[in-house]
């Protein structure tokens, strides 16, 4: 639908930031990509929104402008096992040309430095604000209209990604406590693999179009700039071609929250809200003033089905993180929440698809 874009090059800095001494590593990085910043005038702040990576904001105090802040992302432990960092940077730089992603300032051995977007991340209250959600729907539609170069795989990424995650679940877990929790909640990896094959046999039939999607629009990855009335997306680790309805459903699944103690499925958006959201989305995606009721209904149906796929993907992902991540987050419990939700919904969805 849009012109094909190719990513530009980027600056590589041969620095590896130690997770136990992050600030020293960040300052060493800044000497290379911001040599004019006096080290004594740099303010560093660790941000806490993410559950995959560690993030540090860097501000040169002589420049009293939020737009001059730089973010440094240090990749989470072992995340290179399942995230294609070359593709991630290519995607960010390509989307930046279109005004859909931040500028990359530099890449280092275990992370990247990129542009800060002024504003605030969404939360369970603001995501349904009438001034905000239409901006999110429109921004997603703009992204879904992007076409990448011929070298980028156009098949839905989600099936290969789930298979990759399944292959990375340890058998057994290195900790006896973790293995016991896994066995108690999920029995075995074999059972999960069988469930995956059943899920795929049903959902592979979806008629949802394949688009270039973000695939991880949790609330912390959406920035709202109230002063400018704009929405920006960040963190393109999982950006790839996938089903249109998967990206929408995945975003709706995040309305319930991410903090383990606060997840509440009563916050999941009702049918009326979803239909309004999809209508706004389709107006931009299809470039029409008034999408038809049939078009809206079709996407709504596909979203309900592919919400199931989102739960399974992130449940399996969380089991991999349960073994490897050193982020302070209960990935074992999160896997239980997402996969339990999957099992609650699957019979109804499978019946619809039969």
What are these model-derived regions, one by one?
Residues 212-214, 219:
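Catalytic-loop of the protein kinase fold
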Residues 245-290, 308-326:
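Active-site activation/catalytic loop segments of kinase-like enzymes and analogous catalytic loops
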Residues 1-45:
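Juxta-kinase regulatory segment immediately upstream of eukaryotic protein kinase catalytic domains
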Residues 220-259:
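Catalytic activation segment of kinase domains across protein kinase-like and atypical kinase folds
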Residues 45-191, 202-209, 227-228:
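ATP-binding pocket architecture of kinase catalytic cores
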Residues 192-196:
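Short proline/glycine- and basic residue-enriched helix-capping loop/turn segments at helix->loop/beta transitions
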């Amino acid at each position: 639908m849009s012109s094909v874009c190719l990513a530009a090059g980027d600056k590589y800095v041969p620095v590896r930031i130690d997770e136990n001494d992050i600030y020293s590593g960040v300052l060493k990085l800044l000497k290379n990509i911001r040599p004019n910043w006096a080290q004594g005038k740099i303010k560093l702040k660790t941000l806490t929104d993410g559950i995959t990576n560690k993030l540090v904001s860097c501000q040169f105090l002589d420049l009293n402008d939020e737009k001059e802040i730089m973010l440094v992302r240090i990749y989470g432990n072992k995340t290179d096992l399942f995230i294609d960092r070359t593709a991630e940077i290519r995607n960010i730089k390509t989307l930046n040309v279109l005004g859909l992603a931040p500028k990359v300032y530099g890449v280092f051995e275990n992370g990247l430095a990129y542009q800060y977007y002024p504003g605030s991340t969404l939360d369970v209250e603001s995501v349904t604000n009438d001034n905000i959600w239409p901006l999110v729907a429109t921004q997603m539609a703009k992204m879904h209209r992007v076409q990448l170069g011929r070298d980028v795989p156009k098949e839905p990424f989600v099936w290969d990604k789930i298979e990759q995650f399944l292959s990375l679940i340890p058998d057994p877990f290195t900790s006896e406590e973790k293995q016991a929790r896994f066995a108690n909640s999920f029995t075995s990896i074999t059972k999960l693999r069988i469930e995956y094959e059943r899920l795929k046999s049903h959902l592979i039939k979806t008629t949802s179009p394949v688009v270039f999607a973000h695939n991880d629009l949790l609330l912390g990855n959406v920035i709202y700039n109230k002063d400018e009335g704009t929405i920006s997306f960040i963190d393109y680790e999982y950006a790839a071609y996938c089903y249109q309805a998967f990206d929408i459903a995945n975003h709706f699944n995040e309305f319930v929250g991410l903090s383990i103690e606060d997840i509440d499925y009563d916050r999941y958006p009702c049918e009326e809200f979803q239909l309004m959201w999809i209508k706004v989305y389709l107006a931009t995606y299809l470039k029409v003033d008034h999408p038809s009721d049939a078009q809206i209904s079709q996407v709504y149906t596909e979203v309900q089905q592919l919400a199931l796929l989102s739960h399974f993907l992130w449940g399996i992902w969380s089991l991999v993180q349960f073994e490897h991540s050193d982020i302070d987050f209960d990935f074992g419990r999160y896997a239980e929440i997402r996969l339990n939700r999957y099992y609650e919904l699957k019979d109804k969805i499978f019946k619809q698809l039969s």
